[in-house]
Amino acid sequence: MKDVAAAAGVGLKTVSRVVNGEPGVSEETADRVHAAIRELGFRRNDGARLLRQGSRTSCVGLILEDLADPFYAQLSRAVEEVARSHGSLLFTGSSAEDPARERELTLDFCARRVDGLIVVPTAADHGFLAPELAAGTAVVSIDRPMNGLTVDTVLAANRRGAAEAVGHLIRQGHRRIGYLGDDPEIFTAAERLAGYRQAMAEAGHGVDEAWLAMGRPEPVGIHLALDRMLSGPDAVTALMCGNNRTTVAVLRSLATCPGRTALVGFDDFELADMLPVPVTVVAQDPMLMGRMAAELLFRRMRGERAQAQRLEIPTRLVLRGSGELPC
């Protein structure tokens, strides 16, 4: 705050009033203070007003892609259970796959002096968290690794799980297998696509790029992709879906299409076993991932200084019927 006061040419009390939204400061002076804050990158530390330096708040933060997603909902529940067992409160936010929102949430949590953070990364570079890490905030990455920051990381075996699913379809006699996945800029989407390509290559099968559809799981786009994949002499006979939202959108679209197409989805989802043709899936274990990430976080918060770990949690192929339809 001293630097802000000096840059704005005002006293510390004036800066404090502006930062805390108190009256008694002219608009022109407040503008100068805000300009200095932006230039210097100052952020109010709410906890510092209440706590002695070096004390703990017994609060941790969790930043997910979308709390409404069943996968992340289970992961959040597991983290919360571990936090509670350690006497800590969990704050949760959704980034909506927006790097700017992720950064804003992350730094807001840090400004409120959470003791640690578990983050599903979306940004291309997480170097902005280095000062927080150096200041003693524990950080763990989950579901995807962070770029520009070396921290404990908990992942699912995305590539291996996708390769196992495609290999299973190949063993049912399928050679032309379509793949529908999320934005390939997302780590999990890229890994699962790589697993698909790996399994096809290991079986000696080429991949026609027309068999691929990558992007956000929008119903219209998925329907158009399926029209392309399922028509013509080289139509695919089986489909691999890269996440649960894509699988659900594909199933809705297939309900209007004639024929029976084999399908395996990555991620389990509610009622997948209750459909007319139960859905074969690659099941992740979000509860285990959440527990392991949280335990790593609390070990760091207790002062553990060991080298950062990268843990990969195995997936499980659950055979239910849709992936066993023959060519």
Regions found by a protein language model. Give the residues of each.
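Hydrophobic alpha-helical segments within soluble ligand-binding/sensing domains
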Residues: D152-Y179, A194, Q198, P219-D227, ...
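An alpha-beta-alpha
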Residues: A165-A203, Q309-E324
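N-terminal helix-turn-helix DNA-binding module of bacterial transcription factors
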Residues: M1-R56, C327
